[in-house]
Swiss-Prot record:
It comes from Dinoroseobacter shibae (strain DSM 16493 / NCIMB 14021 / DFL 12). This is one of the proteins that bind and probably mediate the attachment of the 5S RNA into the large ribosomal subunit, where it forms part of the central protuberance. HAMAP family: Ribosomal_uL18_B (MF_01337_B). This is Large ribosomal subunit protein uL18. GO terms for cellular component: cytosolic large ribosomal subunit.
């Protein structure tokens, strides 16, 4: 029987998380969540279990409320890179969860890299 989209999503999420656990060396994790209309990202310190920085397309100061396109994702990526610099973070792991590295997720990652984050 064919797997549903949800089953495939969960398999990808577990596979990505297990790869990140193998590489764990104290660097924070850049966790991405994408919905139908919005995208959000957090820098998470898994050792202490706390969020170090976050950005979302729902934030009014980014000026992208109501837009759910690739350009909005790029603005969120630039915002998280700027906030990571303020927090003193230069390197992290990119945790795409179960989302494919394409479109909005890729635009966010590219903008974060251009902003100075290394992953």
């Amino acid at each position: 029987m064919a797997n549903s989209k949800r089953d495939l999503f969960l398999k990808r999420r577990l596979r990505v998380r297990n790869k990140l656990k193998k590489m764990a060396d104290g660097r924070p994790r850049l966790s991405v969540h994408r919905s139908g209309k919005n995208i959000s990202v957090q820098l998470i310190d898994d050792v202490q279990g706390r969020t170090l920085a976050a950005a979302s397309s729902l934030e009014k100061d980014l000026g992208i409320v109501g837009k759910n396109n690739v350009e909005a994702s790029a603005k969120v990526g630039a915002a998280i890179a700027e906030r990571a610099k303020k927090a003193g973070i230069e390197e992290c792991y990119f945790d795409r969860g179960g989302f494919l590295f394409h479109g909005k997720v890729k635009a966010l990652a590219d903008a974060a890299r251009e902003g100075g984050l290394k992953f």
